[in-house]
């Protein structure tokens, strides 16, 4: 029994190390896991104190065949052509990762698709059965107010019951008095967890995520990865996390 626990712990640590050691923002956590692996002894196995959020995106409506049609989108910013005659179509079972070095192009495309920016030319059309939830790369404006976490999330929920709303916050490890904290004083990681709560409570069947793993710890990244894999709708996302892109 003890040996089995040891083997499970070693495997868990090895998975964390292999996944995150190459990621600069998480390399410290990976190094500490490495030390734990080196020190591990048979009698040192204790229950893990790490907590994983529970990320589960459940669409309120099944998506139809026609999801998104993009025709000739073009956008120039400060004299630089960011999008040039972009054309593509998405169908009901597509999960699309936007990769590459031009982060501004990805963010610009997402902003246009979410109605936050106008293209210079071209058009796009969402399918009639679609509803979208958006995770922006820069969420500063979302939290520039005096609302508490509970009140902030309630404004995005069709059901205004506080217990219902707190349930979504609880999934993202906001407990008890956390709900009365003002959103404008939250850390980067807490804001990301709020945004993911907002996406879950929306019941959208299309998720658009622009670098969602920024500011997240390894446990939260793992939970997000699992939530994205289980999501039955359409995904459009940009991420530097190779594991999320591959899976």
Each PLM stretch: what is its role?
Residues 2-85, 89-92, 223:
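Coupling and communication elements adjacent to P-loop NTPase active sites across diverse families
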Residues 1, 57-247:
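ABC ATP-binding cassette signature C-motif
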């Amino acid at each position: 029994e003890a040996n089995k626990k040891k083997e499970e712990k070693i495997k868990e640590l090895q998975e964390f190390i292999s996944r995150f050691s190459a990621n600069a923002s998480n390399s410290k956590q990976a190094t500490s896991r490495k030390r734990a692996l080196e020190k591990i002894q048979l009698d040192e196995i204790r229950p893990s104190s790490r907590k994983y959020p529970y990320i589960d995106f459940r669409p309120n409506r099944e998506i139809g065949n026609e999801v998104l049609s993009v025709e000739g989108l073009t956008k120039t910013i400060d004299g630089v052509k960011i999008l040039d005659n972009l054309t593509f179509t998405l169908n009901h079972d597509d999960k699309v990762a936007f990769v590459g070095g031009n982060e501004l192009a990805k963010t610009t495309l997402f902003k246009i698709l979410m109605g936050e920016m106008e293209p210079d030319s071209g058009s796009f059309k969402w399918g009639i059965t679609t509803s979208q939830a958006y995770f922006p790369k820069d969420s500063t404006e979302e939290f520039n107010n005096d609302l508490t976490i509970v009140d902030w999330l309630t404004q995005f929920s069709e059901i205004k019951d506080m217990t219902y709303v707190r349930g979504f916050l609880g999934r993202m490890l906001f407990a008890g008095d956390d709900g009365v904290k003002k959103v404008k004083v939250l850390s980067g990681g807490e804001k990301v967890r709020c945004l993911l709560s907002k996406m879950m409570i929306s019941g959208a069947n299309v998720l658009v995520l622009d670098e969602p793993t920024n500011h997240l710890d390894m446990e939260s990244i793992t939970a997000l990865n699992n939530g994205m894999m289980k999501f039955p709708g359409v995904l459009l996302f940009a991420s530097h996390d190779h594991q999320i892109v591959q899976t």
